[in-house]
Amino acid sequence: SLFLHGIKSHVYVALRLFAEVWAAELGRSVDNYCTAPIAEVATLRGWGELDKLIKSSDNWSAEKRYYFIAKMVCHASNYGMKPPTFRLNLLQKSEGKVSISQAEAKNFLNTYHDLFPEIRGWHRETVDTLRRDGVLRNLFGYPRVFTSIIDESMHKEAFAFVPQSTVGTITNITFTKMQQKIENPKIPAP
């Protein structure tokens, strides 16, 4: 829904995780952006200013790079990362400049999953399919067979397969059509 309404997920997550920071920077409450239906957020007065502020935090001092932190939360959550691993990953990616507590890591990841509960549902569905069939398929139906023992260590790889393989297939189809058009300009455009 965010994508359809022109809102980057990283921006929205940063908004929700660090609302007090944005309120202090703007000198006004941002509660209306946090409580509005997603379809209305970008239409609210002042959204453009807030959106730019959140993105600009990527250029603030390392410990205040809230957009970066939110981006890391999104990626970690999408791959099913647990709080201890997320803490270490954030510390590594920030070159040792962003250190958060275990409680903060848990809160950040839980906030993301509260905002997007369908992600955990998709994770469960993916693991169930993997355990049952040993095969996952991308959105074009292309399979990936998992031949080793199915355990938690391979969940990240399983979660990554469908979206990454689907994008790879789309790219392949697009380049094939472009090459065909180059070689035969009379082929109608799709």
Q: Residue locations for each model-derived region?
A:
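Conserved catalytic core of nucleotide polymerization and phosphodiester-bond processing enzymes
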Residues: 1-190
